[in-house]
């Protein structure tokens, strides 16, 4: 599934808000002339999301899903809009619809795991994260997400293992190394944390950005 076919960038620096609104107006007129055009409606909805017009985006995805109830891109981004509107149960329902038609879809599994965590459904979040790792064992992000859930639940050793697995699959991701440092500090394994911090500086992360973590290691 090309679920990122309507890829959204929330950096609107390239276009002013006025330009985005003008583009929306043009696409709205074109969509009125071609009501069955999914492409036009997806483009308009993506611009609505860029402007954080969650309700307008949701309504546009509603229009698409009325015609094509199983359109995965519309379901995914409507769920995204629902999340921003804090309508979490509706967001989860849309993600679940994607998984019903495309079992194991990485983006939907990831979204459901994070959404369950946001909803304080910790057991469901961890179950979903386990499923994510089992079905996508090559994805660094799958391990990192599970590690974050484990860390939040106080499962620190398990979190450390998963951060290490994420790093094995994406060794240049500085965030994973930073999360590993924080986890090592929580485990009071300060020497290992310092070694990881030194590695981060060699990777090009400014020492000033790591100052607080260095301080925590030295205040043991």
What residue ranges belong to the model's regions?
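Register position in tetratricopeptide repeats
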Residues: 50, 84-85, 118-119, 152-153, ...
